[in-house]
Regions:
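Extracytoplasmic/periplasmic proteins that interact with beta-lactams or build/remodel peptidoglycan
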Residues: 1-72, 91, 265-270, 386-392
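Extracytoplasmic/secreted envelope proteins and their assembly/folding machinery
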Residues: 54-58, 97, 154-161, 166-170, ...
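Active-site-adjacent helix/loop patches that line small-molecule binding or acyl-intermediate pockets
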Residues: 66-77, 113, 126-139, 147-204, ...
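Short beta->alpha transition motifs characteristic of CBS
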Residues: 83-89
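A short, polar/charged loop-to-alpha-helix boundary motif
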Residues: 89-102
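Active-site beta-strand/loop architecture of penicillin-binding DD-peptidases
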Residues: 214-256, 261-269, 293-384
Length: 397
């Protein structure tokens, strides 16, 4: 076969696969198509999903039954999606559309992007101290003014990240960045960009802020216009875990001829550097503090100590009311990377629960359960290999 003919065949194959996958989304099918008709022949599609992991995720989603839930697990090293599950309580059914829909306000997850910009391009460090008034969960214009008050408090940037302080993020953005810079960093993280080749995943949206207050809103995630998909939420954590490199998410591993089994097409890994390594490492530390002492601490308090010592776990919470389907979103995006690098670069997990009238289970708790299952059943850590944390402890004694 000539080179041009081979190239045309690959393009045709990809186009047909994309068409079939999009049809699956259009009609809210429960599973991805495994076969596609290509001209006069049929091709097989293989996906990156881990069946055992997906079955476990479905089991825990049915146990807690939030009004809507989506759980994503991505392999940090390859960008392959190991699981992408959507669930709806009303019909007690799973679907494949919710994980890939970008109709969800990102809430405080966007603080990851803002932090990346501030750490890399300004004088802000995790130890920088900011003054604020009022509750950190609100964002009023008066809170952004530097007016002395007996009610004024001080908080480090590290603690502001761990406890998701909107006021400090708003003030830090106004003083240390611009709308253009934040827009560019959002683009680096994959906003306003096509993230996947096989699927017409709608773009996550970040709009340029026009005023200081809009900049504060966007930087803190305190708005309903910055939209994201659960897939993208997991990708954001993966960028941090990968020392600043974005591995574009993939779901198809190969397409082969149904008769000859010859591989017709397998997707190439696409990557881009988003952050310098030192910046990514600082962000890792901040996300780890969120899990240890911040807004996610309660969900990870009872993790098996041996497992915890073998992993570096970081995360970011977020909550906001709005989006489609409408409801109060409870977000958690996280990474779980083995301390022993022989076990690979680990996974990133995003959980989105949408609650209507009743709160059923925390997204951070579901993420913890997924991490525990993955490292016990799917990719067990070798108990005989002492971790770097244990080695450091031995040095101290």
């Amino acid at each position: 076969m000539k080179k041009e003919e081979r190239r045309e065949e690959i393009i045709t194959t990809r186009s047909l696969v994309k068409e079939n996958l999009n049809e699956a989304f259009k009609f809210s099918k429960k599973t991805f198509p495994k076969k596609v008709d290509l001209k006069e022949e049929q091709v097989d599609i293989k996906y990156s999903f881990n069946e055992d992991l997906t079955a476990y995720i479905k089991k825990i989603l049915k146990r807690y039954r939030s009004d809507y839930s989506s759980v994503i697990v991505i392999d940090n090293e390859t960008g392959y999606i190991l699981s992408a599950v959507g669930y709806e309580r009303k019909d007690n059914q799973f679907n494949i559309t919710l994980p890939f829909s970008s109709t969800h306000p990102s809430a405080s997850l966007f603080k990851i992007v803002t932090t990346a910009d501030l750490l890399e391009k300004s004088e802000v460090t995790k130890d920088s101290v900011f003054k604020f008034r009022g509750r950190g969960t609100t964002l009023y214009k008066y809170q952004l003014k530097d007016k002395k008050s007996r009610w004024q408090r001080r908080q480090s940037f590290e603690r502001a990240f761990a406890y998701s302080n909107n006021v400090i993020f708003g003030k830090a953005a106004i003083k240390n960045t611009t709308g253009e810079r934040l827009f560019d960093m959002a683009a680096d993280f994959g906003f306003n960009e096509k993230l996947m080749e096989e699927i017409s995943l709608s773009k996550s949206v970040f709009e340029m802020p026009d005023t200081d207050y809009e900049l504060a809103e966007k930087a803190s995630g305190f708005n309903k216009k910055t939209m994201i998909s659960p897939i993208h939420a997991a990708v954001m954590a993966s960028v941090v875990a990968n020392d600043g490199v974005l591995n574009y998410p993939r779901v198809v591993t190969e397409i082969s001829d149904n008769v000859t089994k010859k591989v017709i097409w397998s997707p190439q890994q696409r990557t881009k550097r988003v952050l310098e390594v030192p910046t990514a490492r600082e962000l890792q530390e901040l996300m780890e503090v969120t899990v240890k002492r911040g807004t996610a601490r309660g969900s990870f308090r009872r993790v098996n100590r041996k497992l915890l010592n073998g992993l570096e776990i970081g995360g970011k919470t977020g909550s906001i009311t709005g989006g489609i389907p409408f409801g109060k979103r409870d977000w958690f995006t996280s990474f779980a990377v083995p301390v022993n690098k022989n076990h690979g670069k680990g996974i990133s997990i995003a959980v989105m629960n949408i609650n209507l009238e009743k709160w059923y289970v925390k997204s951070s708790y579901l993420a913890r359960k997924v991490i525990e299952y993955y490292y016990k059943e799917v990719n067990p850590l070798n108990d005989n290999v002492s971790t770097a944390k244990e080695a450091e402890s031995d040095k101290d004694t």
